[in-house]
């Protein structure tokens, strides 16, 4: 049976790339990016509390890294080039530090690690206050007027179709667990993991 929380792209016999999304993201976001690496086997799991992964705690960096390790092992093991985005960079660094034999190299995109606690408190509180939208149009507007202002329309449409769900209160929300996201923001105050020099 296929695990809906693990997204696989590219040939099964290609070099392995483990793609780790950022906060409030999901593994399927790597689909368009993976098209630029047609020779590679891209493994892109949803993190705990995101997408189709379990939403139950623990939500620590260690729990996320254990999930990444298990997903990598289930799909042929490493070593893999680990590509992280934002929060995914912190997880990639911890994976490289704790399991260096599984990591062939690191690519860190817009890394988030060892962030100021007061900033993380603001972001976590904002997450609690603003975790849903009136409708899909409001969610789209939030993306377009924020960090997704230069994302092609077709990718934004795909994001809304894949990741926006009914919140159960007449509103819509992203397919994430608010408690998991808030806890994960707190994890980013921890000291940055330093991988072995060999990676």
Task: Describe the residue ranges of each PLM region.
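Short "lid" loop at the C-terminus of a central beta-strand within the Rossmann-like core
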Residues: 49, 112-115, 164-165
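Conserved HGGG/HGGXW glycine-rich cap/lid loop of the alpha/beta-hydrolase fold
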Residues: 7-54
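Gly/Ala-rich beta-loop-alpha elbow adjacent to hydrolase catalytic centers
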Residues: 84-88, 92
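Active-site loop/oxyanion-hole signature of alpha/beta-hydrolase fold enzymes
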Residues: 2, 32, 41-83
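Conserved serine/cysteine hydrolase catalytic core
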Residues: 166-199
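Flexible "cap/lid" loop of the alpha/beta hydrolase fold
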Residues: 94-97, 104-136
